[in-house]
Amino acid sequence: MLTIALSKGRILDDTLPLLAAAGIVPSENPDKSRKLIIPTSLPDVRLLIVRATDVPTYVEHGAADLGVAGKDVLMEYGGQGLYEPLDLRIANCKLMTAGAIGAPEPKGRLRVATKFVNVAKRYYAEQGRQVDVIKLYGSMELAPLVGLADKIIDVVDTGNTLRANGLEPQELIATISSRLVVNKASMKMQHGRIQSLIDTLRDAVEARHRH
């Protein structure tokens, strides 16, 4: 049995056509189903529906053989028990710092609000900048407006939400897309099966970008 961990939303919607190219079609619509384990058109393949931030955990610990996760999630997770063999080139966005429009660069110790705590600490450590990182789970844009933080680090798509709240994107930390991740033990035990799936998905990604 091959188990693939996916999260609902944009990543799922963009991944399903790629899986379909490999003959893997869910038996019911994951967006509408309440089931968290969904069989597919192949009797030996099933999908797990989990939170986006949990995909690498399920894969690293072997509860899933493969998964699809955003590079932002993988950077924050930082696990060593994963292969990352393929950039699926879907769910593209940018991981950026942002601050109030026109605000001067704060002097001294910086306060940064984000859900990407590990990414923030690494990023500013590389710059030799002292920071206090404040963990938030959502509505990052609010933090600079109410004096909780000087800047935020968040995923930016169009930047419209930032601008609507008086913020502007500033420094690019990473260009983000979704990646296929594979459990290291699964890759050894089911190498032929998984490598065949990787090759098929790679062909589907390339075909999609030729058009």
UniProtKB/Swiss-Prot annotation:
Q: Which GO terms describe its molecular function?
A: ATP binding; ATP phosphoribosyltransferase activity
Which terms under GO biological process does the entry name? Answer: L-histidine biosynthetic process
The UniProt record lists the keyword Amino-acid biosynthesis = yes
**SUPFAM superfamilies per the UniProt record, alphabetical:** Periplasmic binding protein-like II (SSF53850)
Instruction: Provide the primary localization.
Output: cytoplasm
The record's keywords, sorted A to Z, are: Amino-acid biosynthesis, ATP-binding, Cytoplasm, Glycosyltransferase, Histidine biosynthesis, Nucleotide-binding, Transferase
Report the subcellular localization. Answer: Cytoplasm
Looking at its record, which EC class is this enzyme?
transferase
Record's GO cellular component, any one? cytoplasm
Which reactions appear under catalytic activity for this entry?
1-(5-phospho-beta-D-ribosyl)-ATP + diphosphate = 5-phospho-alpha-D-ribose 1-diphosphate + ATP
Which pathway does the record list?
Amino-acid biosynthesis; L-histidine biosynthesis; L-histidine from 5-phospho-alpha-D-ribose 1-diphosphate: step 1/9
About its domains, the entry says: Lacks the C-terminal regulatory region which is replaced by HisZ.
PANTHER family xref list = ATP PHOSPHORIBOSYLTRANSFERASE, ATP PHOSPHORIBOSYLTRANSFERASE ATP-PRTASE
Could you give the subunit structure recorded for this chain? Heteromultimer composed of HisG and HisZ subunits.
Tell me, in a sentence or two, what this protein's role is: Catalyzes the condensation of ATP and 5-phosphoribose 1-diphosphate to form N'-(5'-phosphoribosyl)-ATP (PR-ATP). Has a crucial role in the pathway because the rate of histidine biosynthesis seems to be controlled primarily by regulation of HisG enzymatic activity.
Family listed: Belongs to the ATP phosphoribosyltransferase family. Short subfamily.
Protein name listed in UniProt: ATP phosphoribosyltransferase
Species name? Pseudomonas aeruginosa (strain UCBPP-PA14)
